[in-house]
């Protein structure tokens, strides 16, 4: 019966929006969990000539050519290391499937509207136009990224051309 009580308790708690939490350096970021298709370990990719450094290349994911973006390079991180913790979050953004390279994935958090604060007017590593806000969990701050807006910016149009070159 305790299992049933736990299910009921969880179902009756106020629901919020769920975010996949990932790390880039010392910062924690969150993206809408509904955009996440899967999480994979980092594998070598096929590099595409004449693309910015943050576009690592493309990979074949079960017959689908998926462009891979290293958010660490995109967000101007200095020390980018590929190790056992480095993962690729594969996102399904409607018309586009994209993989983003991050330092690691920690958990999935549910945030209520009260826990989400407006994005500040300044951001050092990321333009505020790509932020949906800041998630406050006690003393923990989570930078909430509008991943669709980030990956639909003009420079990301290069992803489509890179993927079509390989296809």
Curated annotation (Swiss-Prot):
Compartments reported by the entry: Cytoplasm
Pfam families in alphabetical order: CheW
SMART domains: CheW
GO cellular component: cell tip; cytosol; methyl accepting chemotaxis protein complex; plasma membrane
Main location: cytoplasm
GO biological process, one term: positive regulation of post-translational protein modification
Alphabetical list of InterPro entries matching this protein: CheW, CheW-like_dom_sf, CheW-lke_dom
Domain CheW-like as annotated: residue spans: 16-156
Keyword flag Cytoplasm: yes
Range of residues in the leader sequence: none
Keywords, in A-Z order: Chemotaxis, Cytoplasm
Gene Ontology molecular function terms on file: protein domain specific binding
Lineage top rank: taxon: Bacteria
Subunit structure: An in vitro complex of CheW/CheA(L)/CheA(S) in a 1:1:1 ratio increases the autophosphorylation of CheA and is required for the binding of CheY, the phosphorylation substrate. This complex accounts for 10% of the total number of molecules.
Cited function: Involved in the transmission of sensory signals from the chemoreceptors to the flagellar motors. It physically bridges CheA to the MCPs (methyl-accepting chemotaxis proteins) to allow regulated phosphotransfer to CheY and CheB.
Name this polypeptide is given: Chemotaxis protein CheW
Classification lineage: Bacteria, Pseudomonadati, Pseudomonadota, Gammaproteobacteria, Enterobacterales
Gene name of the record: cheW
